[in-house]
């Protein structure tokens, strides 16, 4: 387990091209949530891309227009589709962003040298079964009615969007994070396309069958997480064992509550596959 909460900077070897990190946010967040990690990476000489998925961050899509996971995940797919064939990225996903990582691994295994899941849904086939839902979807029912739901297709149909109510956010998402980060999130969070997320039934591309297991995966456990509970993380790790498991003492939002140690673990993961 990482012990020290210190800023790290690295001097890259001149002959080696710095790794390209691609950071994927979770439900209701956006590329903005990575601003501390992005800064630490860039001052250390790394290339970083933070992507807004559909209806997230500054993406202008209507949340109620998204009914499939592929629609929601399209910005990541577009990015990887246009990425040079001879180059690779390190994908990093938080929370529901893990579903985006798995989809990308299935479609572009040769363009990904490492996938890092941070307190994230790590399910080989997405949300196919009741067991997948139990392990990979947060169950916050013990806290009461915590979600604001939107019914863009009418009240007779399943909800199209969801966001945690303001009064529950600090308790569930940010209980170890500085107050200013909670204030930032209050300004920036948007309803998530819950209908699209629950359709994330993932299958390998026929031409890439068998390739996904060649992509190394690292799981970073968020040990004090009140959303993706540690027992859920353990269950997903048992079912689809990653190459390595790291532990981080943080809430559900380590990019706010423990950014320096999180940065160090991401660098450690990159070193483990020879990217640095």
From Swiss-Prot:
Question: How would you classify this enzyme at the top EC level?
Answer: hydrolase
Known EC number: 3.1.1.-
Pathway the protein acts in: Plant hormone biosynthesis
An annotated Gene Ontology molecular function: methyl indole-3-acetate esterase activity
Q: Which GO terms describe its biological process?
A: indoleacetic acid conjugate metabolic process; shoot system development
Where, by tissue, is this protein expressed?
Expressed in several tissues of seedlings and adult plants, with a higher relative level of expression in the seedling shoot apex and the adult stem.
Active site as annotated: 95, 225, 252
Q: Which residues form the AB hydrolase-1 domain?
A: 19-138
For whether the record's keyword set contains Hydrolase, the answer is yes
One Pfam family matching this protein: Abhydrolase_6
Family recorded in the similarity comment: Belongs to the AB hydrolase superfamily. Methylesterase family.
Q: What is the protein named?
A: Methylesterase 17
Species annotation = Arabidopsis thaliana (Mouse-ear cress)
Coding gene?
Answer: MES17
